[in-house]
């Protein structure tokens, strides 16, 4: 057994946090959701549309990562908790895909962007292996978990937004806070808390940031409605979005802090803040008992002990450079695919 996670108690369980898979009954009507559903602002709406698509792809990858970790966890309670995380992520992707169909009906290049995002994640595994993928997922969960906490702390962000989308994002934020420690604890069981494990976490965060600074902005740029394309070059057009994400009360400021704290050898997300008060405040407002789903843990621990962590060295720098080059080439192809798709639509 590793890292003080006992056979019966996980850090989430110690705090009374139960990770519950849920399937909400949200419906998204393409005829009632306006194109500019986020306060009528094109830049902000487009950013959240791209985040929905990119997030859905990421969650599919997190599901695979969680399953990969479960195969290496010889602890039933921790394996169950990780499986609950996996189920939540799968349902998140499923619900967001319902909204994505509205975006497809609006003529946005959703499927092309999904394929692009999926390929970027695949490059990480092809070049650097699944432990690196899991480190990227770990960093992603810490970023998204803190993002969710900030949303729950500032619900006024969604004032004047379409109600179905407000419900979607607030429910999603709640569950991200609820399971924020789950992937971390599974990852730590498998990889440990050595100096090399810490370095792997940090490099995973570097991969995540390097990916996000290209993949999300290019998604925002290409998801703009045709009628607003000419406005994209004006800095003032982006000011509301920049203020929302990075201003004095920006939604991403806490996420940056969490990623920075991954440098700590003994990092744990619960050291950043106590999630109990905000979960207790929002649980009855954002979830319903009839949404809850149960499952049986089928198998776990069959590959325990097969993960060996090497020290980060020059070969890892080379892999990162190869990854960045692959991302740039795939981004060029993505832009070409979007242009071709829009030209075909225009000719139709």
Name every feature range the model reports, one short phrase each:
Residues 2-346:
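Non-heme di-metal
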């Amino acid at each position: 057994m590793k890292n003080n996670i006992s056979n019966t108690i996980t850090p989430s369980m110690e705090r009374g946090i139960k990770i519950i898979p849920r399937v909400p009954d949200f419906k998204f009507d393409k005829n009632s959701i306006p194109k500019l559903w986020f306060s009528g602002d094109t830049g902000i709406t487009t950013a959240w549309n791209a985040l929905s698509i990119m997030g859905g792809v990421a969650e599919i990858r997190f599901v695979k990562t969680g399953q990969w970790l479960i195969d290496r966890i010889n602890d039933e309670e921790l394996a169950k908790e990780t499986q609950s995380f996996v189920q939540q992520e799968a349902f998140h992707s499923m619900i967001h895909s319902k909204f994505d169909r509205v975006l497809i009906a609006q003529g946005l290049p959703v499927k092309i962007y999904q394929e692009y995002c999926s390929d970027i994640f695949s490059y990480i595994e092809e070049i650097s292996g699944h432990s690196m993928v899991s480190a990227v997922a770990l960093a992603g969960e810490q970023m998204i978990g803190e993002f969710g906490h900030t949303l729950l702390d500032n619900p006024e962000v969604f004032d004047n937004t379409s109600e179905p989308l407000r419900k979607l994002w607030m429910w999603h934020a709640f569950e991200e806070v609820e399971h924020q420690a789950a992937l971390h604890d599974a990852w730590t069981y498998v990889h440990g808390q050595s100096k090399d494990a810490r370095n792997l976490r940090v490099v995973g965060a570097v991969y995540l940031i390097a990916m996000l600074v290209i993949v999300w902005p290019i998604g925002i740029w290409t998801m703009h409605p045709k009628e607003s394309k000419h406005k994209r070059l004006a800095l003032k057009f982006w000011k509301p979005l920049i203020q929302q994400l990075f201003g004095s009360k920006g939604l991403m400021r806490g996420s940056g802090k969490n990623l920075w704290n991954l440098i700590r050898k003994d990092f744990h997300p619960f050291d950043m803040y106590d999630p109990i008060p905000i979960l207790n405040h929002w649980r009855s407002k954002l979830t319903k008992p009839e949404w809850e789903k149960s499952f049986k843990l089928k198998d776990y621990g069959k590959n325990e002990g097969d993960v060996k962590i090497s020290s980060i060295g020059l070969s890892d720098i080379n892999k990162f450079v190869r990854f960045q080059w692959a991302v740039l080439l795939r981004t060029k192809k993505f832009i070409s695919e979007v242009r071709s798709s829009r030209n075909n639509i225009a000719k139709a």
